[in-house]
Swiss-Prot record:
SMART domains, per the entry: Ribosomal_S3Ae
Originating organism: Pyrococcus furiosus (strain ATCC 43587 / DSM 3638 / JCM 8422 / Vc1)
Family of this protein: Belongs to the eukaryotic ribosomal protein eS1 family.
Complex formation: Part of the 30S ribosomal subunit.
Protein name: Small ribosomal subunit protein eS1
Gene behind the chain: rps3ae
Keywords on record: Ribonucleoprotein, Ribosomal protein
Amino acid sequence: MAAKRATTTRDKWKLKQWYIIYAPDFFGGVEVGLTPADDPEKVLNRVVEVTLKDVTGDFTKSHVKLYFQVYDVKGQNAYTKFKGMKLARSYIRSLVRRKTTRIDGIFNITTKDGYKLRVMAMAIAMRRIQTSQERAIRKIMQEIIYKKAEELNFKDFVLESVNGKIAAEIAKEAKKIYPLRKAEIRKIKVLEEPQVIA
C-alpha cells in the first residue's frame, strides 16, 4: 500500500511543470523564483516572498521583504503584482536599543490613482523622549505620508517607501523635534485596488 502511495506521489510530480515567477514591471520585471504546478490555474494567486536584495542585487537591502502575488500566467511565465512589504524582525530589533524611544504610526491612505494601503511607519529617537515629542513626531509621519499619497501614484509611492526616500523625509523633519537614530516605513499592505471599468 505504501509503495502504491509512493508511486502515485511520483506520478503527480511527473505531471508538474515549473513556472518562472517575475517581479512587477516597476521592480524591473526580473525573475524572482520558480514554482511547480500541474495546472497553470493553480499558479494564479500564489504569493511569493522575496527580499529587495533579490530584486536589485543590493546586499544592504536584504532586510526588506517584498510580497508579490501571481495574477497572470502565459506559457511557463507567471507575472505578479505587489501585495505588500515589511522589514525583517531581526532588523527592527537591531534598531531598538536601551534608552531609545520607538515611535510607531499606522496610517490608512489612498494613493493618487486610487489604491488603498495600510502604511506602518516607525522612528527611533536617540534617547528617551517626552510624550509630547512622540506625538509631534507621529504627526510629522502622518503629514508626510498623507502628502506623498496625494502626490504619487501607487507604483511611485511603493518605490519611494522601499528605497527609503519617504523615511528620509520623515527623519529630516522629525529631527527638528528630536534627533532620530532611524526612520523607516516598516510595513505596507495593499487593502484595495481601484476597480477597472471595462
